[in-house]
Regions:
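N-terminal cap/leader regions of alpha/beta-hydrolase-fold enzymes
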Residues: 1-146
């Protein structure tokens, strides 16, 4: 874990105002329905980011981090990795993430990222990048080769 359970995502010193944010579900190409959190920039964004969390999945920290991205002018979607093995509910301190991490696959994770990228493109974003933490950092790096 990259931070304690109650940690807050940092604010940029140049942060503006974010547009709306909301919880949503995305459907991967294999039919898996994953939790996600969308945060929109207050102005039309040219850049979007898929936030790839640590091993805990879509923890509140990463939902808030998506909003921080929107505050600097990027549309963002934070995704959850556990659509194929866990319900779409809370990922706070009590979530047994390790049993789900062990069942995940790189192929499933790639499909989840593709769903996030497709969602941002539907919003009109032209350039998309990934930002990953812990396990998500390794998969973010891997996405750059695909």
């Amino acid at each position: 874990m990259c931070f304690p359970d109650g940690a807050l995502a940092p604010r940029s010193p140049r942060a503006g105002t974010a547009g709306p944010d909301r919880a949503l579900t995305l459907t991967a190409a294999d039919g898996a329905v994953l939790m996600a959190h969308e945060a929109r920039s207050a102005s039309p964004a040219q850049v979007g980011v898929v936030v790839m969390p640590d091993v805990r999945g879509l923890h509140a920290y990463y939902r808030e981090l998506a909003v921080r991205m929107a505050e600097v002018g990027w549309d963002a979607v934070a995704i959850d990795y556990f659509a194929r093995t866990a319900d779409t509910d809370d990922r706070s301190e009590g979530f047994d993430f390790m049993s789900h991490v062990q069942q995940g696959t790189p192929e499933g994770m790639a499909l989840d990222v593709q769903a996030g990228v497709a969602h941002l493109r539907e919003l009109g974003v032209e350039r998309v990048f990934t930002l990953g933490f812990c396990m998500g950092g390794g998969f973010s790096w891997r996405q750059s080769a695909d």
